[in-house]
Amino acid sequence: MAASLWMGDLEPYMDENFISRAFATMGETVMSVKIIRNRLTGIPAGYCFVEFADLATAEKCLHKINGKPLPGATPAKRFKLNYATYGKQPDNSPEYSLFVGDLTPDVDDGMLYEFFVKVYPSCRGGKVVLDQTGVSKGYGFVKFTDELEQKRALTECQGAVGLGSKPVRLSVAIPKASRVKPVEYSQMYSYSYNQYYQQYQNYYAQWGYDQNTGSYSYSYPQYGYTQSTMQTYEEVGDDALEDPMPQLDVTEANKEFMEQSEELYDALMDCHWQPLDTVSSEIPAMM
């Protein structure tokens, strides 16, 4: 039975032929491509649905090429793929996730997934977090449907080698309630990753952070789309993912502080009150 994947972040020039060639370049054969357009304007909505021969082929393609550079794209882009539910209810089975740190730049979503699924069959996906330029931030997440396998992976793969050129660091990611942006149409079929938070005990320890000072929030991308009188697409993108070790630009911070201080000073100087000679001086009458 045929199965489809959602593909997003498309440029207007990316038509059906472009998408088919891109998959063929990656060694994948697609049955068809449907570009979604606004019915009123005819303008591409920025996403499409790619049909494969069966579910196994679609899943293999998702894990193999998701996050990899998109051939022929200008400006440079990466494959942004997800499951397409087409009216079916999303899979509400429980998810148990791990944070994976110390990833080298060569590790992508497919490599992260393959590293775990070979030993833990309940692994359902891997996500390497990228910055706005498409470069890995050095960490990612994997999710499981079996809590026992998640716990085994945490213990057995802590410090494991074979994924990139550095030993990996693992800690538990605790799920929060998933959030999908609301849309104004009545029918909405969405596939979304849950959001998680965790305290990076092991990851922070390496860099001298106090693991008891707080928690760090992150989320997988979330995709929602509708099939109604119009097609719409809303996404919480990679920019919703935060760096666990943000760099502080001290010079820029001082500059902003001084600018704000100068604005306050100017406001005080522009007011009509004049300083008194002494504490007991009378306040002058208004003119």
Swiss-Prot record:
<dbReference type="GO" id="GO:0000049">
    <property type="term" value="F:tRNA binding"/>
</dbReference>
<keyword id="KW-0963">Cytoplasm</keyword>
<comment type="similarity">
    <text>Belongs to the RRM TRSPAP family.</text>
</comment>
<keyword id="KW-0677">Repeat</keyword>
<keyword id="KW-0694">RNA-binding</keyword>
<dbReference type="InterPro" id="IPR000504">
    <property type="entry name" value="RRM_dom"/>
</dbReference>
<dbReference type="InterPro" id="IPR041085">
    <property type="entry name" value="TSAP1_C"/>
</dbReference>
<dbReference type="GO" id="GO:0003723">
    <property type="term" value="F:RNA binding"/>
</dbReference>
<keyword id="KW-0648">Protein biosynthesis</keyword>
<dbReference type="Pfam" id="PF00076">
    <property type="entry name" value="RRM_1"/>
</dbReference>
<feature type="domain" description="RRM 2">
    <location>
        <begin position="96"/>
        <end position="175"/>
    </location>
</feature>
<dbReference type="GO" id="GO:0005737">
    <property type="term" value="C:cytoplasm"/>
</dbReference>
<feature type="domain" description="RRM 1">
    <location>
        <begin position="3"/>
        <end position="86"/>
    </location>
</feature>
<dbReference type="GO" id="GO:0001514">
    <property type="term" value="P:selenocysteine incorporation"/>
</dbReference>
<dbReference type="GO" id="GO:0005634">
    <property type="term" value="C:nucleus"/>
</dbReference>
<protein>
    <recommendedName>
        <fullName>tRNA selenocysteine 1-associated protein 1</fullName>
    </recommendedName>
</protein>
<dbReference type="InterPro" id="IPR034510">
    <property type="entry name" value="SECp43_RRM2"/>
</dbReference>
<dbReference type="InterPro" id="IPR040434">
    <property type="entry name" value="TSAP1"/>
</dbReference>
<dbReference type="Pfam" id="PF17654">
    <property type="entry name" value="Trnau1ap"/>
</dbReference>
<comment type="function">
    <text>Involved in the early steps of selenocysteine biosynthesis and tRNA(Sec) charging to the later steps resulting in the cotranslational incorporation of selenocysteine into selenoproteins. Stabilizes the SECISBP2, EEFSEC and tRNA(Sec) complex. May be involved in the methylation of tRNA(Sec). Enhances efficiency of selenoproteins synthesis.</text>
</comment>
<dbReference type="InterPro" id="IPR035979">
    <property type="entry name" value="RBD_domain_sf"/>
</dbReference>
<keyword id="KW-0539">Nucleus</keyword>
<comment type="subunit">
    <text>Component of the tRNA(Sec) complex composed at least of EEFSEC, SECISBP2, SEPHS1, SEPSECS, TRNAU1AP and tRNA(Sec). Found in a complex with tRNA(Sec). Interacts with SEPSECS. Associates with mRNP and/or polysomes. Found in a complex with EEFSEC, SECISBP2, TRNAU1AP and tRNA(Sec).</text>
</comment>
<dbReference type="InterPro" id="IPR012677">
    <property type="entry name" value="Nucleotide-bd_a/b_plait_sf"/>
</dbReference>
